From Swiss-Prot:
Belongs to the LeuD family. LeuD type 1 subfamily. The gene is leuD. One of its GO terms (biological process) is L-leucine biosynthetic process. This is 3-isopropylmalate dehydratase small subunit. CDD domains: IPMI_Swivel. It comes from Bacillus cereus (strain AH187). It is an enzyme of class 4 (lyase). Its EC number is 4.2.1.33. NCBIfam families: leuD (TIGR00171), PRK01641.1 (NF002458). It comes from the Bacteria.
Length: 193
């Protein structure tokens, strides 16, 4: 996993509350286990009409929001079933940071495990951040837990364990591999039955 220290990017705004994992990526696209290729199906039923033409009224389809890597959204983001495909779709689309009023617990952990930073922020702060010009680069500094725009500076908090994993680009496998020598020594010592 790539370390996450400072991210600079533009933001897309989708302030709906209770966006569930089926709205993030509909179930018909979950027939694969690869982590890539899901971005084109992100918010599929909102982004496209029945003939797969972009819905011009959907915020992510606005020309000045294309290529955004920060998503500012409502409360309880990622609720519903615990499909890891939802964070995969967000990451594959290009999002590195999701800022919401809150997250479903499993979705929150899945974001972290996939190298994305989910940030919990109150509504007033999110509304200020959402007013940032669509072309402005927003800086998200994980180490100092600060989001900076040209006019505002917002502080956020993150659990130390998750912060360290993201800063160092560690997933479960790489953490396990830090103990490779100890594991080999243990395997050498145990009796074989």
């Amino acid at each position: 996993m790539e370390p996450f220290r400072i991210h600079k990017g533009t933001a897309a705004v989708l302030m709906n509350n209770n966006i569930d994992t089926d709205q993030i990526i509909p179930k018909q696209y979950l027939k694969r286990i690869e982590r890539t290729g899901f971005g084109k199906f992100l918010f599929d039923e909102w982004r496209y009409d029945n003939e797969r033409h972009e819905n011009p009224n959907f915020p992510l389809n606005a020309p000045d929001r294309k290529g955004a890597s920060i998503l500012i959204t409502g409360d309880n983001f990622g609720c519903g079933s615990s499909r890891e495909h939802a964070p995969w779709a967000l990451a594959d689309y290009g999002f590195r940071v999701i800022i919401a009023g809150g997250f479903a617990d499993i979705f929150y952990m899945n974001c972290m495990k996939n190298g994305m930073l989910p940030i919990v922020m109150d509504k007033e702060m999110r509304e200020k951040l959402a007013k940032t010009d669509a072309r402005e680069q927003i800086e998200v500094d994980l180490e100092n837990e600060v989001i900076t725009t040209s006019t505002h500076r917002f502080h956020f908090t993150i659990e130390k364990m998750w912060k360290e994993k993201l800063l160092n680009g560690l997933d479960e496998i790489s953490i396990t591999m830090q103990y490779e020598q100890e594991i080999k020594e243990y395997e050498r010592r145990i009796a074989v039955y």
